[in-house]
Amino acid sequence: MEILDLENEELLGVFFEEAQNLVDILEENIMSLEDDPNNSDTIDEIFRAAHTLKGSSASLDMMELSDFTHIVEDVFDAIRDGKVNINNDLVDLLLSSLDVIKEMLALRIDGKVYLNDISDLKSKLKQFLVIDDQTFIKRFDGNSIKNNFCLSESDLEEIREGLGIGQKVLRISVVFNSNSNSEVENSGLKIFNILKNLGSVLHTIPKYEQIIEDKFLKRVDYYLIYSDIEGVKKSLDSLNLIESYLVDEFNVKEELKKLADEEIKDVDLDSNFVLNDNFDFTEDEISDLLLEVENQKLFKVRLDFVKDNPMATISGLQMLQALKSLGKIFKSIPDSSELLADKFFDFVIYYLISNTSEESIAKKINLPDVVSHFEIKNVNLESLKSVRLKEDDEAPFKENKNIKKNSPISVNLIRIDSKKIDYILNLVSEAVISKSSYNQINSEMITLFYNFNYFYDYQESFQRNFLIDLKIVFKDAGLTLEDEIESHINSLMSFKMEKALKDISELRNSFFRLLQNFKMTSGRLSRIITDLHESVLKTRMLPISNIFSRFTRVVRDLSKKLNKIVNLKMEGEETELDKSVIDDLVDPLMHCVRNSMDHGLETVEERVKRGKSKAGTIILRAKNEGNVISIEIEDDGIGIDPKVIRRKLIEKGTIKEDAIYSDFELINLIFAPGFSTAVQVTDLSGRGVGLDVVKKSIEKLNGTILVESEIGLGTIFKIKLPLTLVIIQGLLVKSGSETYVIPLNNVLETHRITEHDIKLLENYHEVYNLRDEVISVLRLDKLFNITRDDSLIEKFLIVVNTSNMKIAIVVDSILGEEDFVVKPIKDKFSSSAGIVGATTLGNGKVVLIIDVFKLFDLQKDTKE
């Protein structure tokens, strides 16, 4: 029985999602330390996030990420212990370190490894970890190796967290020879590596980072998970680099009690959990197991998991992957498919087939931030032959509802509010009930059908045998058919037909009631399905705070770079957008914010001269407007001068000198390709790329972007986006023999027209006069090469908005307004101009959805 291969995608996907969440926590809290450097809660939260990221990445063999995060963690440990003070320079250094962590994660997501040299950055971080050597040596003076180093509470906690059930900690205090032999230079690291091969080194004094710095240390204390004191002594006795050493058992609980005034709750060391000898196998599994084990050993490994670990929902998968490196996982409880679910399990039992030792397994699973307790049992294979599965031994694996699930921004995973899931499940339950109603109705309709068949057969038989029956009746009565035939026939037919009409009436009434019930049930099921569909779509919705929160760091860094003081305000962060829109909105908003920082806001000196406050303000604002989301990026800067825009456009040849444009139209020409008013090129602006890309990106999302500005007061970028790209409201239109959908959020108005209402200019360009406004006319039959229906006297004109202008689309008829589920077009049709996707109608017909922003491009191509 082979357990599912869970390597890679499922586990890594959840890890990257959680890792991104941890990075966001780190970034947000590190920046908050600038304003409140002594906030212990913030420092603790940063330390926990770094500690978790370090441990989780190590368990997945991402050592470049784990090792570097370990250094960052140690810096915060020093901050937490009051050994390091926070200032702006340290915050800058920590944020730079966080950028490296982000790069490491990004490369791992792409299947690559970070290889850049960051030794300078590591050295800067380690400057905060160095302990003065003289102080260190004086602490040892006294000629007695029993004069132990003082352990802080955080040191003891680190040791305590690393322990499993029944494990011992040995303290190995080593004094090194102080000769000048180069072999001794890194003697502390040599001993560390020797001890690491024996067990798990939980802690060292001084810390590991100082040990590896290639400087001579007189003494180092190592805290090792290992039970064989004599084995340790044997490994150290023959080493010339050691002057003396002492190995003794270290009682963590007693040391903690010395530091605390109250009794320490002994949750880790005195658990009442013990592995029993009952096995969780069926008879068939035992047979398979005995065949697979052969000359190997079977270990039963139980792991209890840390509940407050942000990555608690993948702990079971993490440990499964770790144990697989030692052998074959025959079975896990819960099984691998359950471990893939995004939920927390208090504990998991693994059955490992391997030739390894219990010590090796302990080293592999000893991750304090993941595992709170563990026990390893070497199973007696002979006992398996008589074991049967016992129902009372099955442990309840329940999801821990106290685990907090934060919304991530990263790989293609979505966290869903449990209330939304509960609502969906209720709707599904209603759908199941309605399905039962349908089954009942179906059964009744079948019965009714058989009744009709019986009635039909009866009437047919009656008509066929009527005369025969009549002759028999007459013969029995001693009558001749000719004498009384008319009266008897009338009497008999009257009786039969009266009964038949009564039966038909009852059947008709039954069928009518059935149809009424069917109609009511159909309506109820339709409502449930609609609600279910909408609820599923809501699970894709994420708050826009997922994007807005990123700009705190952006504004901070750019403020320093541009020597400006900027306050960032956010409004409507709870506004929700479809995840697919969220993912593609980051870059456009980034361009707009950078533009406001670089071009919009003045320097401190310029603002003071204009009578403004020294600090400029940027507001990120989001709000719902029906089926559309409105996003605004507002600044209180210098504003945009339409005269400057006009002059630049004339210089570039984009517009003619005699061209007439309103101020609003001129300002919105900043989205023209290659447009820039920057005097010099910098790494932020001046290259003429950016805002045209922003416009294209927004239009790709089926949205619009406009700019409003007033000289001296500021500028507002206004973006309108559909709530979701999955479902849209649209007009179903017909042109020739083809049917299309035009997104309703682009439609301004519709008109019924004749061909005489459309005018032709000298350049063969068709236009329509809409309340004294001349707008361009596009015909779908021309654009998509459809045979035109010239028999129609009247047609329809649909006026649509394309960001900064209106166009009119001519169609033969408007079939109606509906909601449409958008399906992407793949392969050779994916780049079709003028088409944004496809949808399926209720009758099964597939129709294309028009991309109104690309229709002009399609018309140019058609003319050429």
From Swiss-Prot:
Could you tell me which Pfam families the record lists for this protein?
Answer: CheW, H-kinase_dim, HATPase_c, Hpt, P2
Q: Which SMART domains match?
A: CheW, H-kinase_dim, HATPase_c, HPT
Might you name a Gene Ontology BP term for this protein?
A: chemotaxis
Please state the span of the N-terminal signal peptide per the UniProt entry: none
Q: Does the keyword Phosphoprotein apply?
A: yes
Q: Which key words tag this protein in UniProt?
A: ATP-binding, Chemotaxis, Cytoplasm, Kinase, Nucleotide-binding, Phosphoprotein, Transferase, Two-component regulatory system
Q: Which Enzyme Commission number(s) are listed?
A: 2.7.13.3
* Compartment(s): Cytoplasm
Tell me the residues on which Phosphohistidine occurs: 51
Q: Where is the HPt domain?
A: 1-108
Q: Where is the CheW-like domain?
A: 727-864
What are the record's GO terms for cellular component?
Answer: cytoplasm
* Catalyzed reactions per annotation: ATP + protein L-histidine = ADP + protein N-phospho-L-histidine
MF terms (GO), sorted A to Z: ATP binding; phosphorelay sensor kinase activity
PANTHER family linked to this entry: CHEMOTAXIS PROTEIN CHEA, SENSOR HISTIDINE KINASE CHEA
Free-text function comment from the UniProt entry: Involved in the transmission of sensory signals from the chemoreceptors to the flagellar motors. CheA is autophosphorylated; it can transfer its phosphate group to either CheB or CheY.
The name this protein carries in UniProt is: Chemotaxis protein CheA
- Organism encoding this protein: Borreliella burgdorferi (strain ATCC 35210 / DSM 4680 / CIP 102532 / B31) (Borrelia burgdorferi)
Whichever gene encodes this chain, its name is cheA
